Design a protein with these regions (language model features):
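Rhodanese-like catalytic fold shared by cysteine-dependent sulfurtransferases
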Residues: 2-29, 37, 46-79, 88-120
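Short, surface-exposed ligand- or partner-binding patches at beta-edge/loop junctions that are enriched
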Residues: 83
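Structural scaffold elements adjacent to functional motifs in cytosolic proteins
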Residues: 39-41
């Protein structure tokens, strides 16, 4: 829980500009080690099936019902750790979810995750 406190403590310093926190693969791994954190893969179903972070839920950010699916399935106020392939789509998802959740985004995406940890 220490990493979450550190991350959100930093966000508090820039509350007007920071809507979510972008982290690298190592910090993301520490965040998702907390079983209370919801891990969200925002890539397509095909990308998800080809490989994903263990325990992740898949909701495609490019689908028109992304926000409705995410907000109906995740209780408000939860910490949501999300990622895409390279870090582009996840920023779109992070912006959409930040008003209702504590959002951590994997800036390097699944590509960075697999470079750091392989496809475990």
């Amino acid at each position: 829980m220490g990493i979450l406190s550190s991350i959100f403590g930093l966000m508090g310093c820039n509350a007007q500009t920071a809507r979510f926190k972008t982290v690298d693969a190592k910090a993301f791994a520490e965040v998702i080690a907390d079983t209370c954190v919801v891990v969200l893969d925002v890539r397509t179903a095909e990308e998800f099936q080809a490989g994903h972070i263990k325990g992740a839920l898949n909701i495609d950010v490019l689908k028109s019902d992304f926000e409705q699916k995410a907000t109906s399935g995740i209780p408000e106020g939860k910490t949501v750790a999300l990622y895409c392939r390279s870090g582009n789509r996840s920023k779109k998802a992070a912006n959409a979810l930040a008003p209702k959740y504590k959002v951590i985004e994997l800036g390097t995406g699944y590509i960075g995750w697999t470079k750091e940890f392989g496809t475990r």
